[in-house]
Amino acid sequence: MDLFGNKVKAGETLLSVNPFYLRPGNLSESEFLKNVETLPLRLDQPVSSAPVGRRVGNRLFVMLHNESDLEQSGVLGLTGGGLTAVSPLRFRIPPRTAQSFELPIKEVRKKESPTELMLFLNGTTFRTPIEVISNQQVGKEFKLDNARGKLEFGNGRILLEMDVKDSSDAGRTGSRPLWETDCVELFFDTDPLNLPLIHPDAYTRNTFRLFITPRDPVQLHTWGAIQASACDLQIRSNPSGYSFRLEIPAETGALLGFDVKIDDAAGNSLRETTLGSGKKLFRNRCQFSLAGERKNQ
């Protein structure tokens, strides 16, 4: 029966996130447990993809999960939603692992059909709906309407330097939320291509946020695994605003999820400026911009 006590037809049943209960019927406890231990399971699709992919220009980053006990190899493609793969991509994944792949793509005449990832595996083609999220590429130097910055990462550290134009002093934060005063919100993800099968947009242990409040006695606030005491922050005020240099101890790969939101409070108004085009950065790490360059596979 299902979670609500409704009877489920006996026979082969598709396993999903919705649980159901097995009942012993006329079997004894020992007979029932023996049958459960020997219950046959069939994995029709041993390789699955995360429900989202991250697009940067003409590249789409996807993550494939091999849920079987055998190495799997096949061909990866994309269709629908006005996108297609430039050419099929061959893949090979060890058992019980997940791996990210970079798929070259191009735009085609827009179609009404949804975007689907195609997996040709063991003689069968599987089609999986996928949400394509477009991310901005951030270089070593970047600009916002009211700021400019430099970003470096590698060798166990992230180094960020920024010059912010904000000549209106909002005073100390006091009881206000940090993002409702003069503040620089920083978003980091040291493993941005890790896309789980469930809730790939959710923050992970590799995601953290930092808040810089230049007008406060305590100027650095952290959320996540990074501690403020482990960071080195230097802030200087100037007639047009302020500048800072921030060094963060963090292991990174070739790509870094990164974004900036500058909050400028002046009286009863609040101006917000964001580096990338991502929405709801405070809860969706897949919306972060991407910095760095991944080497060819």
What are these regions (language model features)?
Residues 1, 79-88, 223-232:
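Short beta-strand and strand-turn-strand segments in soluble, beta-rich domains
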Residues 1-48, 238-270, 275:
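Beta-strand-rich recognition/accessory modules
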Residues 2-13, 82-110:
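Intrinsically disordered, low-complexity Pro/Gly/Ser/Thr-rich segments with frequent PxxP/GP/PP motifs
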Residues 10-12, 52-57, 94-100, 131-139:
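Solvent-exposed, conformationally flexible loop/turn segments
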Residues 24-58, 107-134:
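Terminal connector regions
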Residues 54-61, 155-159:
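Contiguous beta-strand segments within globular domains
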Residues 63-70:
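Asparagine-centered strand-capping/turn motif at beta-strand->loop junctions
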Residues 110, 114-297:
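Structural preference for beta-rich elements and adjacent junctions enriched in aromatics
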